[in-house]
Amino acid sequence: MGKLFGTDGIRGIANEELTPELAYQLGRVGAYVLIKGAKDAKVVIGRDTRISGDLLTSAITSGFLSMGVDVIDLGVIPTPAVAYLTRELQGNCGIVISASHNPAEYNGIKFFNHQGYKLPDEIEEQIETYILNNEEIENRVTGAAVGKRIELKEATRLYMDYLKTTIECRFEGLKIAMDLGNGAVYEAAPQLLKELGAEVIIVNDQPDGMNINEGCGSTHPEVVQRLVKENKADVGLSFDGDADRLIAVDNTGAIVDGDSMMAICGTNLNEKHILNKNTIVATVMSNIGLDLAMKEQGCQVVKTKVGDRYVLEEMIKEGYTLGGEQSGHIIFLKYNTTGDGLLTALQLIATVKESGKTLSELSGMMTSYPQVLVNAKVKNENKLAYMEDEVIMGEIKMIEEKMNGVGRVLIRPSGTEPLVRVMLEGQEQAELEVLAHGLAQLIESKLG
């Protein structure tokens, strides 16, 4: 597979790229690198609903057990629940078997440290080096020193009970429509919202191992949009396969994306004086409408590179409490260490309930400006050369002047392909299309 770890753990087609042999090795090496020398060591492991979940969970579990580490098996459970329970159960680390929003034939393995944070790059590199170099780890315990597997049947209940403590109201009188994506949240989400008093309408709650994300979930918001309209629901919720992100829909059927949810929840937290430093952390791809909406509330938006790990890094470094991505990865750092779809849903619904307004009224506080994204094919070695090209920089300056302060140009070299991504944001969609394609063609002609 070459380099094992990507930006969100290890991913691949299960039993072809991501094999049980590799998972077993990850268990052994993970135990050696993360836990060596720890007394009464234990790890916490959970998975989504993919058919290959059992295969990979069994294999990585065997690796840990062979190193004398106990494994607490949480079963099928959302990714953020693994992060929370790693802390709560005082695990030495946590492991998630999931490929998030990818199709069912894929799977992934992701590690959390003992605090529930993703591993830093240098630790992932250590694990990777051992495996890619086939370095043998001698430690093979025997007898009573072999690790034990412990099944924690009440894992989802512990997570749901914790989430209830993050809000101060109940949801009686609200009708919530949900697309559960045949994923990890298929039991927890409807159960929790019913317990909080909401009327619940659900689809895609029958996982069969192969239907996770299949025409449903957060990458197919049209499913929950239809459900909201048909049932006259107050709020629609659409989760991805491992429930670390959420896309919402308002009472009119309009999409409420990560930017809008951050504006709504951020304003609510700010009014309660619990939005630390009056700041939200977003990525460079977030809509300029978020900046303008938060400015009106006397708040600021700090921008990072694309990726929830960079958002989290900035939040930890500066002590911010709310951050996320347009795609629906929202981090409420006071409550969890990773994007959490179900937690975000509770915070959003609680804001609706406490405000006495509809979600469409609340989302009206932010105007999303049209965004146009065009890829320009360039040679790999030329991906940063646009900054030195006077003609390209002159064209960018001309476009920015034309926008007159209401809009922007963002050029992002791809990390994995010979591409430069051209993103324009402004008031007029048609004009943006012309300008973005023109700029992309210019970049291709000069650097392709």
Curated annotation (Swiss-Prot):
GO terms for cellular component: cytosol. It is an enzyme of class 5 (isomerase). The keyword Membrane does not apply. The modification Phosphoserine is found at residue 100. It catalyses: alpha-D-glucosamine 1-phosphate = D-glucosamine 6-phosphate. The keyword Aminoacyl-tRNA synthetase does not apply. GO terms for biological process: carbohydrate metabolic process; peptidoglycan biosynthetic process; UDP-N-acetylglucosamine biosynthetic process. InterPro entries: A-D-PHexomutase_a/b/a-I, A-D-PHexomutase_a/b/a-I/II/III, A-D-PHexomutase_a/b/a-II, A-D-PHexomutase_a/b/a-III, A-D-PHexomutase_C, A-D-PHexomutase_C_sf, A-D-PHexomutase_CS, Alpha-D-phosphohexomutase_SF. Its EC number is 5.4.2.10. Binds 1 Mg(2+) ion per subunit. The active site is at residue 100. It holds the Pfam family PGM_PMM_IV. Keywords: Isomerase, Magnesium, Metal-binding, Phosphoprotein. Activated by phosphorylation. CDD domains: GlmM (cd05802). Its cofactor is Mg(2+). One of its GO terms (molecular function) is phosphoglucosamine mutase activity. Mg(2+) binds at residues 100, 240, 242, 244. Belongs to the phosphohexose mutase family. NCBIfam families: glmM, PRK10887.1. PANTHER family: PHOSPHOGLUCOMUTASE (ALPHA-D-GLUCOSE-1,6-BISPHOSPHATE-DEPENDENT), PHOSPHOHEXOSE MUTASE. Catalyzes the conversion of glucosamine-6-phosphate to glucosamine-1-phosphate. This is Phosphoglucosamine mutase. It comes from Alkaliphilus metalliredigens (strain QYMF).
